[in-house]
């Protein structure tokens, strides 16, 4: 039997007296498995932040005179397989309306705490971006967002034998989003329908992580 270390899981080989193999079993390393889950959770966080300025853009379409400084705070939780994450996000920005166009910039910070079966994480994510758009008099609009992201995770894990493994996991990402829609008012009411289509593209750099 070979015991689990920080990279390789448990493996058991049973031999006959003549040296022939009876059975071989291998168990996945739980630290490696947890690092993969942390990476997946960071990807989901990155995905959620690609177009998180869309609510602000909706405000600008609904209230033409609402340009200027703005801020938004969000708290929530997410889950992926056996990792559970709670987070708080602070987002700030400023924009300017110029005729049927508007331009703006935004920055956000997210602090999160993750719980796994064999440890925990402390997550810190930053993003910076520019956005702009066009709003036609007949209700058509185009929104564009370009952002840069930084994702950092400090993790404290343990192997099946109880050996502690801690370290840092970090990467950078870039994203862009383009949305087209048409706000169609319903006659004699305050209601409207808004068909829309959005194209999002993002890239996360290769991940770097260090352990003790």
Protein language model features and the residues they cover:
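Aromatic-anchored, glycine/proline-accented short structural segments
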Residues: 191-212
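Acidic/proline-rich low-complexity IDRs
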Residues: 6-7, 12-14, 144, 194, ...
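Outer membrane beta-barrel translocator domains of Type V secretion systems
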Residues: 25-196
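Generic preference for hydrophobic/aromatic residues in regular secondary structure cores
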Residues: 1, 11-15, 168, 183, ...
């Amino acid at each position: 039997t070979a015991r689990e270390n920080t990279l390789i899981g448990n493996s058991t080989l049973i031999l006959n007296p003549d040296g022939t193999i009876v059975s071989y079993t291998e168990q996945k390393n739980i630290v490696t498995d947890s690092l993969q889950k942390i990476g997946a959770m960071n990807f989901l966080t990155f995905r959620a932040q690609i177009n998180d300025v869309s609510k602000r853009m909706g405000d600008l379409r609904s209230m033409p005179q609402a340009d200027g400084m703005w801020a938004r705070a969000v708290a929530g939780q997410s889950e992926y397989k056996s990792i559970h994450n709670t987070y708080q996000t602070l987002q700030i920005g400023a924009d300017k309306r110029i005729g049927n166009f508007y331009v703006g910039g935004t920055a956000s910070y997210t602090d999160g705490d993750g719980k796994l079966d064999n440890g925990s994480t402390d997550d810190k994510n930053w993003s910076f971006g520019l956005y702009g758009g066009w709003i036609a008099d007949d209700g058509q609009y185009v929104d564009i967002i370009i952002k840069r992201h930084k994702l950092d995770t400090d993790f404290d894990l343990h192997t099946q034998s109880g050996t502690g493994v801690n370290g840092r996991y970090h990467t950078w990402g870039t994203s862009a989003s383009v949305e087209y829609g048409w706000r169609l008012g319903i006659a004699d009411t305050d209601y409207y329908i808004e068909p829309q289509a959005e194209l999002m593209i993002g890239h996360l750099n290769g991940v770097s992580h260090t352990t003790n």
